[in-house]
Each structure stands twice: as C-alpha cells, then as structure tokens.
Regions:
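A domain-level signal for the structural core that forms small-molecule/cofactor-binding pockets
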Residues: 2-75
Length: 75
C-alpha cells in the first residue's frame, strides 16, 4: 500500500521514470509509508482510444472517487 495506477498518452521512458520518482517522493513525504510499500504502474493509452478505454470506460464510471477531474478539485 499504496498502489498508484496511471494511464496516460505515450511518453518517453525518461519522462515516465521522472514522474514515477516524483509521485513516489510525494507518497513518502505525505503518506508516511515506507519505500517498499509503494507500487506505481503506468499504462500508455493511444489518444484515439482514450475516450472509449479511459474516459467512459473508467473515469465516468468512478466519478464518486475522483479527487481531481478535468483539472478541477472535487473535494
């Protein structure tokens, strides 16, 4: 715990690694967990597939758990 799953448009490996390290650091500082407890995955989604797979396939079905949606706070 925690497991952070990210879905995003394709990026190069260096960018994905930097983002994962920054997210890991935030969880270490804010969540207070050990480094061994953190798992982060990144799945690339083609822009043409985004709405079908992610927007309507996941986001719209899970709106009640969204903390930030379309760049706006939902808390």
């Amino acid at each position: 715990m925690p497991y952070i799953a990210i879905k995003a448009y394709p990026k190069d490996e260096a960018v994905k690694r930097r983002v994962a390290e920054r997210i890991k650091q935030v969880f270490l500082e804010e969540w207070g967990c050990s480094p061994q407890a953190i798992s982060i995955s990144m799945k690339e989604v083609n822009p043409d597939d985004w709405d079908r797979q992610v927007r309507y396939g996941e986001i719209e079905q899970d709106r009640e758990h969204m903390l930030i949606l379309d760049g706006e706070k939902k808390y």
